[in-house]
Swiss-Prot record:
Its main location: membrane. Belongs to the chromate ion transporter (CHR) (TC 2.A.51) family. It comes from Cupriavidus metallidurans (strain ATCC 43123 / DSM 2839 / NBRC 102507 / CH34). The gene is chrA1. It holds the Pfam family Chromate_transp. This is Chromate transport protein. Induction: By chromate; induction increases when cells are grown in the presence of high sulfate concentrations (3 mM SO4(2-)). InterPro entries: Chr_Tranpt_l_chain, CHR_Transporter, Chromate_transpt. GO terms for molecular function: chromate transmembrane transporter activity. Keywords: Cell inner membrane, Cell membrane, Chromate resistance, Membrane, Plasmid, Transmembrane, Transmembrane helix, Transport. The chain crosses the membrane at residues 26-46, 67-87, 93-113, 124-144, 172-192, 214-234, 237-257, 272-294, 299-321, 330-350, 356-376, 379-399.
Length: 401
């Protein structure tokens, strides 16, 4: 009774035993994971299970599985949402908030430092050389991610394959991402697999696209209209990241490059490369993009706006997830959205490859990256990116001077 414990009765009626760890211990664990956790969302989720469920036994396997299911069901980067949910299990809103910040903060600070270096030294040969190699390797990495996601999530379902191929085509042709197609895909699968009564009676509603805000302004450190625009755009982007953080890439490209012209193609590919060489969630690349657009304020606004939907989509439904999370309509909706997101990722690989594969050496580097990742399953992306950077440092000066 001497140490206060948070209430532990869930909305679903189950009662957790008192936690065997302090909130400080949990926050420090996620601070360390955010600093050293390379390998992408699947690897990060695996680390959490290994450490928190198996080794430390702070979290039960049932709670972990519920968090993983919610992270797959709701919009938001999988690893960040799972971390937030695990913080919520015993320490509710305070735990979810502190864990979320601790998990994201290390990689955010890293991309800020890389953003400063990119702006400060971007015109120098060595910086151009690094990204010459890394940009090509990133194409190979994303291609393998798209392949694995397609194989795992689309499977043999003909309707999901239809949605997937439509989104690939739309992304390649328009070189942008139409947000409402994600929702339309989810509703289509929902209505097909688990149609509501009113639909079976022959009634149908129409769906309308929600346009993105118009582009405006030049870069300015404290340009409030620009910062507001950044906030609105990245909040929308954060709301359409299903499963893998890579799902945000085509959406960002459509807004940041094609519509708003905040960055050019090369800068955008470099931003994706930064996400690959830093630990923590891939989505943190938004901090790098925000820094290039509007300095430190832009980085802070972009990161906060992107992760706010992730946080809300985890904390708000958490008490009710046990009761409603396995409804056929919800599961069908998520399958549709996931197929659409993976199709957009695959289309983005093609779009970005046209910008990053500029000659025979970069084409070979991308192909070698794909071959290595297929051959050596445990080979980490940061190792590949580091090797590509070294190749770029050697090859770029020889080929361009």
């Amino acid at each position: 009774m001497n140490s206060p414990q948070p209430p532990d009765t869930t909305a679903a009626g189950s009662v957790h035993t008192a936690p065997t760890y302090t909130l400080r211990q949990l926050v420090m664990y996620f601070l360390r994971l955010g600093t050293l956790g390379f390998g992408g969302p699947v690897a990060l989720a695996g680390y959490m299970h290994r450490d928190l469920v198996e080794a430390k036994q702070w979290i039960t396997d049932a709670d972990y599985k519920e968090g993983l299911a919610l992270a797959q069901l709701a919009p938001g980067p999988l690893a960040a949402q799972l971390a937030i949910y695990l913080g919520y299990v015993h320490y509710r809103i305070v735990g979810a908030t502190l864990v979320g910040v601790a998990f994201v903060l290390p990689s955010f600070l890293m991309v800020l430092a890389l953003g400063w270096a990119y702006v400060r030294f971007g015109g120098l040969t060595w910086m151009q050389s690094v990204f010459y190699g890394v940009g090509a390797a990133v194409i190979g990495i994303i291609a393998i991610s798209a392949y694995k996601l397609t194989k795992k999530s689309v499977g043999n379902d003909k309707l999901l394959w239809f949605i997937y191929l439509v989104l690939v085509a739309v992304t390649v042709i328009t070189e942008s991402e139409v947000a409402w197609l994600f929702l339309a895909a989810g509703v289509l699968v929902w209505f097909w697999r688990a149609p509501p009564k009113w639909l079976r009676q022959g009634k149908m509603n129409a769906f309308a696209a929600t346009p993105l805000p118009a582009a405006s302004g030049m870069m300015s450190t404290l340009d409030w209209p620009l910062l507001s625009q950044i906030g609105v755009f990245f909040a929308k982007a954060g709301a359409f990241v299903f499963g893998s953080g890579l799902a945000i890439v085509p959406f960002l490209y459509g807004g940041v490059v094609t519509e708003y012209h905040w960055l050019n193609d090369k800068q955008f590919v470099d931003a994706v490369a930064v996400a690959m060489i830093t630990p923590g969630p891939v989505v943190i690349t938004v901090g790098f993009i925000g820094y290039l657009v509007a300095g430190l304020p832009g980085a802070c606004v972009a990161a906060a706006a992107t992760f706010l939907p992730c946080y809300l989509f985890t904390v708000l439904p958490a008490p009710y997830f046990k009761k409603y999370g396995k409804l056929p309509a919800i599961l069908a909706f998520v399958d549709g959205v996931t197929a659409a997101a993976i199709g957009a990722i695959t289309g983005a690989v093609i779009v970005l490859a046209k910008r990053s594969i500029v000659d025979i050496p970069t084409a070979l580097l991308a192909l070698v990256t794909v071959a290595l990742l297929l051959k050596f399953k445990k080979l980490s992306e940061p190792m590949i990116v580091a090797g590509a950077a070294l190749i770029g440092l050697v090859a770029y000066p020889l080929l361009h001077h």
